[in-house]
């Protein structure tokens, strides 16, 4: 696995603990392999490393050729996310059977079954949250690797601009393993988004 996907960022004991926790039931024959990728942590610079480096260069070239379109998409998505966050924090008013009486509805008493004569102010959800972005890294994406990398980058950049903590992970199946390649983690700085261009699609989709 290390020769194909680089070293795991977990120690051997941590890998055992993670697999014992999550690989149960119908997944008991599955083995999780968590890595930052062969370009980030290679054992040796073998053919798999060179293939991954070549795809990274293709992904970056695609970004360079479509830079303005990608930047525009990032901006549009980021603004949508920011607006959604503002709305999410706003209070809203709903009809209710208790709260502040609305005189204009008093005529309904005895005439209709509608007993919602009041308005009640409710606080919107203000809890914090994080987002996980999963990217299909299986061979089914082999014909559009640069596009997938760009799409992942657009989403990650927009989330970063909106100030939303997020993690981006690629997944595929290889030799009985489910490989989870971490491109960025929740608290990583924005420049870490560039690692999404290390995306390479091969192996299977579990």
What are these regions (language model features)?
Residues 71, 77-88, 137-141, 145-147, ...:
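A broadly structural signal marking compact, well-ordered functional cores
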Residues 79, 83, 87-90, 94-97, ...:
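Solvent-exposed, non-transmembrane amphipathic alpha-helical segments
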Residues 107-108, 123-206:
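Von Willebrand factor
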Residues 1-128:
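Acidic/polar low-complexity segments with low predicted structural confidence
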Residues 32, 108, 117, 140, ...:
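Residue-level preference for alpha-helix termini and adjacent loops
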Residues 94-101, 131-136, 196-199:
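Generic detector of short, locally flexible boundary/turn motifs and exposed helical patches
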Residues 5, 9, 33, 49, ...:
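Sequence-level detector for tyrosine residue identity
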């Amino acid at each position: 696995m290390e020769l194909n996907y680089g070293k795991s960022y977990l120690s051997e004991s941590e890998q055992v603990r993670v697999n014992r926790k999550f690989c149960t039931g119908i997944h008991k024959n599955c083995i999780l392999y968590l890595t930052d990728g062969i370009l980030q942590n290679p054992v040796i610079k073998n053919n798999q490393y060179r293939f991954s480096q070549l795809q990274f260069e293709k992904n970056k070239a695609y970004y360079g050729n479509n830079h303005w379109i990608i930047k525009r998409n990032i901006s549009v998505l980021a603004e949508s996310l920011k607006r959604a966050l503002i709305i999410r924090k706003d209070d809203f008013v709903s009809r209710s059977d208790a709260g502040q009486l609305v005189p204009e509805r008093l005529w309904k008493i005895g005439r209709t079954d509608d007993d919602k004569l009041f308005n009640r102010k409710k606080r919107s959800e203000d809890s914090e949250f994080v987002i996980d972005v999963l990217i299909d890294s299986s061979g089914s994406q082999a014909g559009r690797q640069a596009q997938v990398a760009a799409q992942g980058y657009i989403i990650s950049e927009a989330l970063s601009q909106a100030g939303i903590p997020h993690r981006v992970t690629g997944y595929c199946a290889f030799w009985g393993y489910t490989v989870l390649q971490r491109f960025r983690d929740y608290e990583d700085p924005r420049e870490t988004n560039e690692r999404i261009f290390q995306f390479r699609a091969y192996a299977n989709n579990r």
